């Protein structure tokens, strides 16, 4: 072999390719894991937003109510019915467990379903009331990736 020859050997090329492959696999793995983490966090944030929306909708209507009554619906789930000072029903909230598994708002008797408040599936909805307060404990939802979200709240009947 002559001493003035320049170039790289097959062994050197193989080593460089193996190192490049290891770096590429590491970068792809990091990207995929980051993407999965972002998706989980994003869907959980959406579920939290929907749970907050449901609680805020119930609270807004409850604050204007004179009387709040909780009774079981046809499926045995608690249904919150709100009445004004003239004892006229103006809002009701229920969990459609057997149907779309969402919290619905309605009004009137018999209830006119105004549709679901939010689109995140509900696992549990418990509501109770006394003379001056309405308690939601708990409202349990799950994100599309299965992350649980749970909220509880108490709200006052300010129109008493």
Model-found features: residue ranges?
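Edge beta-strand at a domain terminus
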Residues: 148-160
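Short, exposed beta-strand-loop hairpins at the edges of beta-sheets
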Residues: 138-147
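Type IV pilin-like appendage domain
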Residues: 69-133, 150
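Aliphatic-rich helix starts adjacent to a transmembrane/signal segment
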Residues: 4-59, 63
């Amino acid at each position: 072999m002559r001493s003035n020859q320049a170039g790289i050997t097959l062994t050197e090329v193989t080593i460089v390719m193996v190192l490049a492959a290891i770096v590429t696999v590491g970068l792809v793995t990091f990207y995929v894991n980051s993407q999965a983490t972002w998706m989980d966090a994003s869907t959980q944030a959406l579920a939290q937003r929907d749970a907050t929306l449901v609680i805020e909708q119930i609270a807004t209507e409850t604050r204007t109510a004179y009387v709040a009554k909780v009774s079981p619906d046809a499926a045995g789930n608690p249904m919150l019915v709100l009445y004004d000072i003239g004892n006229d029903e103006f809002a009701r909230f229920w969990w459609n467990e057997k149907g779309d598994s969402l919290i619905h708002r309605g009004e009137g008797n018999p209830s006119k379903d105004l549709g679901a408040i939010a689109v995140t599936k509900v696992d549990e909805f418990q509501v109770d009331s006394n003379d001056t307060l309405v308690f939601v404990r708990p409202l349990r939802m799950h994100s599309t990736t299965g992350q649980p979200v749970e909220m509880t709240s108490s709200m006052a009947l300010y129109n008493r």
